[in-house]
Amino acid sequence: MVMDYLRYGMHPDVPYDASIGEEMSAEEVIELGVDVVFWQNTASETLAKQLNDAGIAAVNIAFTDYESMKKSISITADVLNTDYAREMASKFNAELDSTVKEISDITSTIKDEDKLRVLNLRNFETLRADGKNTVADTWLGICGAVNVVSEQNLEGNQYLTKEQIFEWNPDVIMSSATGDAAWAYEQSDLSTLAAVKNKTVYDNPAGIFYWNRYSTETILQLKWASKLFYPELFAEVNVEQEIKDYYKTFYGYKISDENIQQMLKVLTPVGWGE
């Protein structure tokens, strides 16, 4: 699926409204003449079996943490079966490993009592959050934060209640939805939450996909979030330059300074969809 508002012109040949939903049947996929289908959602298991039975390779690339993410990247490269794909997969996996080590070496010195307690939301509308055994739980831990959902021993995607959020009272709230931070600050019924009082509710950046979710842009999430949480420990990190380097290295794309700021503010790129 192509993000319908955050493509930043990286692949202008892809139609603005290009997307494939779960409603597609095996027959419709077969008619497209594809050789391989990559899938990751458990809701697609039946379709994947039907495609495999029809002679079309349906490859599961689901992942829940960085180790399984690296495996899915390598599997994708092997399926594409080109030297370039394998080179880029190896480069990405190495970059992820080095980023994790670099940040962990610093955050491992933070005392438990000094760690920020963070809630990572899809949005305030659904209050859908990430618990244990998720990519969000992985990057939060590496960045030296405590995932308040995991703290309750809750796994996977969770739909929370407002009462739970008040009970846990996180220091920081992250949301994947544009404008959620500004919205939260205007809600009188949320005003007693620590994150609202302290203005530490943040719209999480997004690019090709949401950085804080199941995205290879998690490399950027690690660098951005660690500096956001502990600016004094990561004062030397230049997030804007990291963004430039990342998209140039892994997408061959020279992103503009304007688009970097739009990305960091989770805004629709100028001219997108016109």
Label each residue range with its predicted role.
Residues 1-42, 148:
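A short, structured surface patch at a secondary-structure boundary
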Residues 105, 158-164, 185-191:
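Alpha-helical scaffolding within the catalytic cores
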Residues 37-38, 172-176:
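Periplasmic-binding protein-like
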Residues 129-156:
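Alpha-helical, coiled-coil/dimerization segments enriched in small aliphatic residues
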Residues 54-55, 143-144, 196-197:
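Short, structured coil segments at secondary-structure junctions
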Residues 24-33, 53-54, 159-169:
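Short helices/loops that flank or line small-molecule/ion binding pockets
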Residues 46-128, 149-150, 203-272:
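Extracytoplasmic substrate-binding proteins
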Residues 43-53, 176-191:
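A ligand-binding cleft/hinge motif common to bilobed small-molecule-binding domains
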